[in-house]
Amino acid sequence: MPAARQQRGAAVEAAARALLEQAGLRLVVGNANYRGGELDLVMRDGPALVFVEVRYRRDDRFGGGAASVDWRKRRKLVLAAQLFLGAHPTLAALPCRFDVVDASGEPPVLHWIRDAFRADDC
């Protein structure tokens, strides 16, 4: 991936984290990599564990970032979340949800989609 694209991705993820922390969520870990995929942000929202996918698109011509979280991507996120929970058994009993932060435009405008999908939808 080109350096400029990596920088953009890191900046958008940092902005998404700041947005969520302003809303009261607390970071557990960022960029957790597993064989099946990556978890951009893992956060706590009260008693819930939240797996956050951050997607950036320059424009929403093809549906924007949220539209790019298709069933294949959702399945990878669920698998990565299962691996994360297996590696962190103290968190495994918590209720979980999957959120998406959709970023688009220049400068990016962020939209937080709580409970964007459920693990049993995949």
Curated annotation (Swiss-Prot):
Alphabetical list of InterPro entries matching this protein: Restrct_endonuc-II-like, tRNA_endonuc-like_dom_sf, UPF0102_YraN-like
One Pfam family cited in the UniProt record for this chain: UPF0102
GO molecular function, one term: nucleic acid binding
Transmembrane segments annotated in the record for this chain: none
Alphabetical list of SUPFAM superfamilies matching this protein: Restriction endonuclease-like (SSF52980)
HAMAP family, alphabetized: UPF0102 (MF_00048)
Family the entry assigns: Belongs to the UPF0102 family.
Protein name: UPF0102 protein XCV0816
